[in-house]
Amino acid sequence: MKYGRTFNFSAGPAMMPEPVLEEIRDEMMNYRGSGMCVMEMSHRSPVFQQIIDEAEQDLRDLMGIPDNYKVLFIQGGATLQFSMIPMNLMKNGKAVYIETGAWSKKAIAEAKKVGEVVVAASSKDKNYTYVPDCSDLDIPEDTDYVYICENETIHGVTWNELPNTKGHTLVSDQSSMFLSKPCNVSDYGMIYAGVQKNVGPAGMIVAIIREDLIRDDLKDLPIYLQYSTHAGAGSMYNTPNCWAIYCCGKVFKYLKSIGGLEEMHKRNLDKAKVFYDFLDSSKMFKGTVEPEFRSLMNIPFVTESAELDKEVVAATKAAGYDNLKGHKSVGGLRASIYNAMPKEGVEALVEFLKNFEANYGK
């Protein structure tokens, strides 16, 4: 690759588009005549105000975000949202969660510290290799919201059809699929995503939240943990993650320039097909997720043994394919092929794995 870069299959932080990195490099020492790097400038300056305003508008354009939704840039990562969501949205003290993998499981554990959690469906019975049928969930009338993790980064499971919430607010963690395909924002009360997987550098989440869900009656909740604080201050109640906002803004513009989320989705379908076709034809490697629920972003796979898995990880790393080791909680291997991963990277990895299989033991 250019600049001696590697194909980085990390689940996050992950690759960013090369044209974006080049533009960031060119602006590093003197951002548009300001005489300083974005990392150095005041968040209260007119220059940075323009950066954050453009980032929000470009995201609104990309996703078609309605005017009655706020876009918030909040520090703390998706893990903080596991707590902030129930703290802010549990008006009646009850929420329904769907358990489809490690990240929804963690969100459930945190929400239970705040109020009552009803796990209406789970795929734990088959080690989170599918999404349960959620067309007719048992949802209590006084439920405040229904929560899903729309793409499970660790287990490689994705939702193809949203749950029937029976009129209740839907909240979705889209961290590892954010901006990978078109999304009808009006189907959700809230969408959030840690940006380090499919957009920019670590240290921030983007929250898209319907205005009627932003409460101003949470006086006993620490001020930073209230969505109303961030919404009222334009995501700048305190010093935000200026660098992440700037980098994400560049990615939003890049996605617009290539044809938006429709084009990105086509590319992602194409890349994933290359890898899944290989897995389905291989005798050494096999996918772990039921085909109907396979993620376009995170592809877990295994060999016949943990020892061979380790051999493959070592061999791929030596050949310039980084971060293919599966998550420590599940083992195996995992290829994360987010938006910024070029098709050539997937094709090159597949070719390497084919050769590894053909020559193994010879």
What are these model-predicted stretches?
Residues M190, V195-Y276, E290, N359-K362:
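Active-site C-terminal subdomain of aminotransferase-like
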Residues M1, T6, A318, G331-K362:
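PLP-dependent enzyme catalytic core of the Aspartate aminotransferase-like
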Residues R5-E56:
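A glycine-/small-polar-enriched, mobile loop at the entrance of the PLP active site in fold-type I
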Residues F285-T316:
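Conserved PLP-binding catalytic core of the aspartate aminotransferase-like
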Residues S34-Q81, N88, A102, E110:
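Conserved N-terminal alpha-helix of the aminotransferase class I/II PLP-enzyme fold
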Residues G12, A111, S123-F178:
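Active-site phosphate-binding strand-loop segment of PLP-dependent enzymes
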Residues T79-V146:
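PLP-dependent aminotransferase-like
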